[in-house]
Amino acid sequence: MTKSLTSRKRIRKDFGRIPTVAPMPNLIEVQKSSYDQFLQIGVPVDKRTDSGLQEVFKSVFPIRDFSGKGELEFVAYELEEPKYDTDECQQRGMTFAAPLKVTLRLLVWDVDEETGARSIRDIKEQDVYMGDMPLMTSNGTFIINGTERVIVSQMHRSPGVFFDHDKGKTHSSGKFLFAARVIPYRGSWLDFEFDAKDMVYVRIDRRRKLPVTTLLYALEGAAATALREARTAEGRSVDPSEIAGMTSEEILDFFYQKLSYKRDDKGWKVDFKPDHLRGVKLMFDLVDAATGEVKIEAGTKVTPRAARKLAEDGMTEMRVFTEELVGRYAAEDMINEASGEIYAEAGEELTEAMLADMEKAGFTELRVLHIDHVNVGPYVRNTLAMDKNTTREEALIDIYRVMRPGEPPTLETADALFKGLFFDSERYDLSAVGRVKMNARLGFTMQEAPDTMRVLRKEDVLHIIRQLVELKDGKGEIDDIDHLGNRRVRSVGELMENQYRVGLLRMERAIRERMSSVDIDTVMPHDLINAKPAAAAVREFFGSSQLSQFMDQTNPLSEITHKRRLSALGPGGLTRERAGFEVRDVHPTHYGRICPIETPEGPNIGLINSLATFARVNQYGFIESPYRKVVEGTVTDEVTYMSAMEEGKYVIAQANAALTEDGHFADDLISCRKASDFEMVQPQDIDYIDVSPKQLVSVAAALIPFLENDDANRALMGSNMQRQAVPLVKAEAPYVGTGMEAAVARDSGATIAAKRAGVVQQVDATRIVIRATEDLKIAESGVDIYRLQKFQRSNQSTCINQRPLVKVGDLVGRGEILADGPLTEMGELALGRNVLVAFMPWNGYNFEDSILISERIVSDDVFTSIHIEEFEVMARDTKLGQEEITRDIPNVGEEALKNLDEAGIVYIGAEVQAGDILVGKVTPKGESPMTPEEKLLRAIFGEKASDVRDTSLRIPPGVTGTVVEVRVFNRRGVEKDERALAIERQEIESLAKDRDDERAILEGSFARRLKELLIGQKVVGGPRGMATGGVISEDLLSGYTAAQWRQIAVENDETATEIEGLKKAYEESIAKIQERFENKVEKLQRGDELPPGVLKMVKVFVAVKRKLQPGDKMAGRHGNKGVISKINPIEDMPYLEDGTYVDIVLNPLGVPSRMNVGQILETHLGWACRGLGAQIGALLEQVKRGLIPINDLREKLDDVYGPRHAKEDLAPMGDDQIKELAFNLRSGVPIATPVFDGARESDIVDMLRKAGLDSSGQVTLSDGRTGEPFDRKVTVGYIYMLKLHHLVDDKIHARSIGPYSLVTQQPLGGKAQFGGQRFGEMEVWALEAYGAAYTLQEMLTVKSDDVSGRTKVYEAIVKGDDTFEAGIPESFNVLVKEMRSLGLDVELGQSSF
């Protein structure tokens, strides 16, 4: 693999032994592909598949009016260009969306009243605007009202049929009651269940249960199907009263086999079938009908082996006594055809009297149901006997009464309701997934029931009941609802599709009513459509759905993890309270699909999961994982993606199974997975092998080195805490990584990657300009301008800042990293810093996971981060007049206004602290009665004296920082102030610079291509002074400007045509650039769309620098978290023998009980990386001085990296590249130790030896305070530490006076409300226990809700008096009011005690 520009500058030594065959899919593919399939933007209208938005429109349209005269058809839809780009939407607080235009066709029919025939009278087609459709950004997010949001994918139970039992919990006997449930994608649920008496019932939508035979009677029988076919052939319809349901005989015939008993002079005999006797205890002797011999005596239990032996011995029929037939069930009606007398009906139990009558009547053959009460139970037959309904009409009316209690049923309405429940595609939809799942469970083929058949069929119902009965008889298995074959993922596209369908259905009703109320001949489609319900449904989904979440933008990893999250919560999913242990637990099918580690701690554990690294979602919504095919014990490079259902059939080996050079398994027995179990299997029996060892964990877990050495609970904390790492001022990639860092940085969109190959023309801190060298389409610009984000605020108030990595003149390839983003370094994710750690106790300052850090960490800004706070103020139009943003604020001194410009807005770069004014604003006061003085002033000066109050935007407590950006928004038509105009001018200058640069590069490339075409051609015309007839040379052209070259005409027609095409393309490109510039300028100058009543809005962004301080939370990657207890002076820290002071001291007792040994291995390996880096740095210095040849440096690098890297990466490098690589390795050699395939203990020892360090990883440390060495050696090394988003500055808070609750008059709680500390019930008990009566009284009255008392106390304190009197607390008055509301009249009287 060729290394990119950035990865060549610093190569990560890889300890992985297993080669990666399949590339890891793009990490945000889940979001992007789903929404692309929903919108189908790039697909031509005629090639769109029936999915997503197209399917929604097709399923709702055509809409017909009630009379049948008008019909509104859907033709096509088109998404136009979005009005604003993503940056503009974020700045203006708008939604990034494209207008949706739908082409509709209105058909008007003429209806012949006599015959009912219809003919088309008129067709009108029109484009109708149907609201805006939010678009996904290139990073897989949505911008809704200016904020970035993510739609989380939802896990839900797949549609289909599921068989289960109650685990013996329902009935006191502990008997298993089996049930089957048909879950459609939308429509009514159908449940089949047994009760304690073994009767089979059916429930529709969890209503009252009905005997299952009622449902079967309601289904069409064979006779009705034949009648329907005959009528259809004649072109006539069938009346519901003519349709006959299934008969008792048909029902019994489907569920039971028939046995035919024949009568001869010796009695009854029947065919001998070994299967029918399996496990049966004989009531009578088993007699061979042919010989009369007793084969097995009565009372014996027949084993399958004995029954099989009898058949092998030639027994074909057995003799049956008449007594044995008593209690059997007739398989069909037994009728005397001569007299018409009925002896037994189908399903009726045979008695001795019946048999005697039949014998008299001369019956020689008797057909009975094969029910032996052992292998086959009489459940359906008993239900049939118990059912009061016997015909289809009775069954339909019974179903109608259950579904619509209280309404009078008729056969027509009952028939329509029943058909609408399960057999009407508009109301019932199994979905393609549901049909595929049902076919697989019931054994149907795709030919019998294709996935377009989305309603239930009679065969489905019958087979479900049959399988349920077989389960009861002990055949088959119940379903595991937590198996990933029974749970599927609904991604953005599908969630959006469902929501849009809801909106369109609301719209449909309105359209239908409007079609009936207007003159259909004169209206256009536009007049019938009101798109508000559809637009409202979309807005509601993105704005308030549980699955539409404010994106976690703390760092690139948290973004990517949020987009890959799978939630079992949300509409149509589970709730926290109802979810049991089984749903939350790790299931064997999670392997390679859902990460078993990354899930939140707390009530959501196991309900919110993360997709595994290599997993992808297939067209049916099931998660697939990749495997390499194994053919006859040889591992191939063919990769197959399989869902959990498909995987169950195969034997799959682990990725770390030992292989030989030629791909054979090295061992005779291999540990493999088969259908959720582990087995030892021979190589030739293996079907597949895992693609990579990291395919079973999520992205965050795959970033933890030595994950295999950490306890699962700590790994969970480690993967969760990496998402909380704050972007630091200087990012540093870890010495000990896993190789996933570059993939996360690339796919998260934090870095900037080149869209196409080219040459870097210009670079500064805000943009990179590249002249493209590939994909040069004639009509397109050959220039790519990448704007870098500078100090932008993220959703979590962290800082987004990008820095260029390339230089002018660099050749870059497609996909190469051009700029680093927040928490990335050289294109790799860099969540924290490598610091020198010692594991030892230090004066109790690392007790209970506390962390002791060196002052160097603070002074060198190692863990300093920048946070950007946003403050916003609006000037509104109030009833009393307009608010004004101004510098002229009443009763405010000049000192407080020093940072404001003449418009009253703070300067960029001003250093501000709590209480400072950011934007001056005044609000009109209501008219108040004037004092004589004011009257005098009014009379003299003729103006109001200060009738405004100060409502300026001030900095809240606890914030100190620098103003980095100001944005001013003006309503259209409102005059812009000087500050707004200055910002606008600056923006326009920046756009003009982009335009001019793009033009210049375009002109250069045009001139070059024109020159190539002109040289060697014969001149036939040109600018003044150019002789015709001569041949064009480079010297000739150098005498003219590039603009004059365009006037040259050449003799060769072909070249002339080519030159004309080139000129045309150039002019079009220049025009496009100018048009784009003018559009953007026009948008800037136009004014903004502000909320109603707002005239002006100002946003001020303040950057706050947060240094590390005691109380901040830090963590490693192994769940080793702690709070900083003390920042120690450097000279007091323990130091190494060479005088190096350690940066951080951790408690060694935090390791054994937590079992996260990975941190110790990381420390040792980091120590070796640092040592090797120092050696390489020393050699580089010698090379630069000319003391040693560069080959010595090459040899050292070859030794460090090993033969594989030396051959692939180092050998092709030139001397300058080797020097640059060595320069970047001075601080430490980065290594990758992939999860489950990382560095072994021997590798760590080897690295330590190469670095010239003690292989134990321990050194003698000395105490910085005394200079004495510590008693024993200490583990020292480099560990990667993160600073988490739990900063003490955000949490510390104090209040003296502040806001109070309206009802109780007690202080509010929480920092956001500037509240107080709650003195709770238990604290009151403590004061009571100590007998501190006065303190207690103070707490319960004047410090809480004694309104008059607290005012008096304040006054007393101001006067210097320290006595006070407590009054009645307000909460007592609330209690009295509460009691009065209960009807208890409580009055307070003065007592004379």
Curated annotation (Swiss-Prot):
PROSITE patterns recorded: RNA_POL_BETA
GO terms of molecular function: DNA binding; DNA-directed RNA polymerase activity; ribonucleoside binding
EC number: 2.7.7.6
Subunit structure: The RNAP catalytic core consists of 2 alpha, 1 beta, 1 beta' and 1 omega subunit. When a sigma factor is associated with the core the holoenzyme is formed, which can initiate transcription.
NCBIfam families in the cross-refs: PRK00405.1, rpoB
Catalytic activity from the UniProt record: RNA(n) + a ribonucleoside 5'-triphosphate = RNA(n+1) + diphosphate
Alphabetical keyword list: DNA-directed RNA polymerase, Nucleotidyltransferase, Transcription, Transferase
Family under the similarity heading: Belongs to the RNA polymerase beta chain family.
Task performed by this protein: DNA-dependent RNA polymerase catalyzes the transcription of DNA into RNA using the four ribonucleoside triphosphates as substrates.
Keyword NADP included in the entry's annotation: no
Protein name: DNA-directed RNA polymerase subunit beta
Any one of the GO BP annotations: DNA-templated transcription
Main enzyme class: transferase
Alphabetical list of Gene3D superfamilies matching this protein: 2.40.50.100, 2.40.50.150, 3.90.1100.10, DNA-directed RNA polymerase, beta subunit, external 1 domain, DNA-directed RNA polymerase, subunit 2, domain 6, RNA polymerase alpha subunit dimerisation domain, RNA polymerase Rpb2, domain 2
Pfam families tied to this protein: RNA_pol_Rpb2_1, RNA_pol_Rpb2_2, RNA_pol_Rpb2_3, RNA_pol_Rpb2_45, RNA_pol_Rpb2_6, RNA_pol_Rpb2_7
One cellular-component annotation, GO: DNA-directed RNA polymerase complex
Residue ranges of the TM segments: none
